[in-house]
Amino acid sequence: MAYPFQLGFQDATSPIMEELLHFHDHTLMIVFLISSLVLYIITLMLTTKLTHTSTMDAQEVETVWTILPAIILILIALPSLRILYMMDEVNNPSLTVKTMGHQWYWSYEYTDYEDLSFDSYMIPTSDLKPGELRLLEVDNRVILPMEMTIRMLVSSEDVLHSWAVPSLGLKTDAIPGRLNQTTLMSTRPGLFYGQCSEICGSNHSFMPIVLELVPLEIFEKWSASML
């Protein structure tokens, strides 16, 4: 999860988030090299006393500064498209959970079970226990099995919302009348926090998301106790 004065991303918990971190580093290195080259050229132009005022045409230079940016853009676009298609791919999910956005809480329904659904509200600051996080804790966590492909169906009952969990690389818009889907898979157990990421009204800041990823045996015991 995030911590105060954090400069980087949250620790990756899913294969998608790991790919996004690699892509970020890849793109940042390209930007760093381009910035260094531009800074070097500017410094050279400001410090050199040599001038060349008779140059009217330079086909070679124009060819290079046309082709080189195109190659750089391709090197950025290809891995980006690969990750984009990976995020849209849904292959034989082991579990499907439907989440609906409301003003201002989330409701969840485990569609593979006959009657397993609940609402998830933020716990008010006055009711927090020692060690719990302000504006991030909820009364009902979403319990999910780790190391399994899970399909999330996301929609809204009223206005636009956005269901986002950064450490899993998830951010899916909740749109009234439309059902969006995304997949998640956690490589380790733990608590993972998110929030509504679309301005949805006066209490937009009070719509936290808490996923608790557990081993399959614990998930089965929990689901049996909820039925």
UniProtKB/Swiss-Prot annotation:
Residues 1-14, 88-227 are mitochondrial intermembrane. Its EC number is 7.1.1.9. It holds the Pfam family COX2_TM. Gene3D superfamilies: 1.10.287.90, Cupredoxins - blue copper proteins. One of its GO terms (biological process) is ATP synthesis coupled electron transport. It is found in: Mitochondrion inner membrane. It catalyses: 4 Fe(II)-[cytochrome c] + O2 + 8 H(+)(in) = 4 Fe(III)-[cytochrome c] + 2 H2O + 4 H(+)(out). Binds a dinuclear copper A center per subunit. It is a multi-pass membrane protein. GO terms for cellular component: mitochondrial inner membrane; respiratory chain complex IV. Residues 46-59 are mitochondrial matrix. Mg(2+) binds at residue 198. The chain crosses the membrane at residues 15-45, 60-87. InterPro entries: CcO_II (IPR045187), CcO_II-like_C (IPR002429), CcO_II_C (IPR034210), Copper_CuA (IPR001505), Cupredoxin (IPR008972), Cyt_c_oxidase_su2 (IPR014222), Cyt_c_oxidase_su2_TM_dom (IPR011759), Cyt_c_oxidase_su2_TM_sf (IPR036257). Belongs to the cytochrome c oxidase subunit 2 family. This is Cytochrome c oxidase subunit 2. It comes from Balaenoptera borealis. The lineage of its organism: Eukaryota, Metazoa, Chordata, Craniata, Vertebrata. The gene is MT-CO2.
